[in-house]
Amino acid sequence: MENISKIKSAKLGGLKSQFKLAPAVRMPVTFEEIDKNNPREAAVLALFYPDKDNKTCFVLTERAQYKGVHSAQISFPGGKIDKKDKDLSATALRETEEEIAVTDVNLIRELTKTYIPPSNFYV
């Protein structure tokens, strides 16, 4: 529980921190520059759970193979916002249920949006 409290209160690094880990070819941009591209919205869930030894693990999935830019990539469960989703948290929960059949989830917090240029998604 102590770690959850720390996660809830930790300062987010924001867009600046994301570019520290981005490929060198991805130039830093501002939220305003990203918004000019009219990105589509999506959400993912970083799902943490204890293993049999009570060590913290998290879920990754492998995307299906198709002719898109994210074919067969390793990812968090998630996907595009749907008109019936009330917000991005609802999107992440719905997509997680669809992809890995997990329904009993306690959300801790949202993180800074991440822009994915190849598919023009804000996640």
How should these model regions be labeled?
Residues M1-S75, K80-V123:
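N-terminal leader/linker segments that precede catalytic domains of diphosphate-processing enzymes
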